[in-house]
């Protein structure tokens, strides 16, 4: 059996995620998920044979809000998982510096030394 990455069952966002900054409300991922909510409202009108763009504007707004809210927590979880992965990677790099030699950094116009 494969061990799970997060041993705590049913934890969407651990308490450790509170230390991260919240995603910006103008994050393109959030705006895209809100747009998907709007499209789902249009598809709902299409399936129920209502006028697509004009019927149920309150319902479309509800879909946008619900998708945006769910997307906010999905983006927050994604940021948390990336932060955990980065912490593990940098911890490994700190413990094994011989595997990661520092390369010489030079500018475009400068001559390379060595």
Curated annotation (Swiss-Prot):
Checking InterPro entries in the record gives: NDUC2 (IPR009423)
| Pfam families noted in UniProt | NDUF_C2
Q: Which GO terms describe its cellular component?
A: mitochondrial inner membrane; mitochondrion; respiratory chain complex I
Q: How does it assemble?
A: Complex I is composed of 45 different subunits.
Similarity comment text for this entry: Belongs to the complex I NDUFC2 subunit family.
* Gene Ontology terms: biological process: mitochondrial electron transport, NADH to ubiquinone
For this UniProt record, the keywords arranged alphabetically read as follows: Electron transport, Membrane, Mitochondrion, Mitochondrion inner membrane, Respiratory chain, Transmembrane, Transmembrane helix, Transport
| Residues annotated as transmembrane | 56-75
Query: Source species, please?
Result: Homo sapiens (Human)
Annotated membrane topology is:
Single-pass membrane protein
Q: Where does the UniProt annotation locate this protein?
A: Mitochondrion inner membrane
Main location per UniProt?
mitochondrion
Is NAD among the key words of this record?
no
Name of the protein this chain belongs to: NADH dehydrogenase [ubiquinone] 1 subunit C2, isoform 2
Q: Which domain of life is it from?
A: Eukaryota
What the protein does comes down to: Accessory subunit of the mitochondrial membrane respiratory chain NADH dehydrogenase (Complex I), that is believed not to be involved in catalysis. Complex I functions in the transfer of electrons from NADH to the respiratory chain. The immediate electron acceptor for the enzyme is believed to be ubiquinone.
């Amino acid at each position: 059996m494969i061990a799970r990455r997060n041993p705590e069952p049913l934890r969407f966002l651990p308490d450790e995620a509170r230390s991260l900054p919240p995603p910006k409300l103008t994050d393109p991922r959030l705006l895209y998920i809100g747009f998907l909510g709007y499209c789902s409202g249009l598809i709902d009108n299409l399936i129920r044979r209502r006028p697509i763009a004009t019927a149920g504007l309150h319902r479309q707004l509800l879909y946008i809000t619900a998708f945006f809210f769910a997307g906010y927590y999905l983006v927050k979880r994604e940021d948390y998982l990336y932060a955990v992965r980065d912490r593990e990677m940098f911890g490994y790099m700190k413990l094994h510096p011989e595997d990661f030699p520092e390369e010489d950094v030079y500018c475009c116009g400068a001559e390379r030394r060595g």
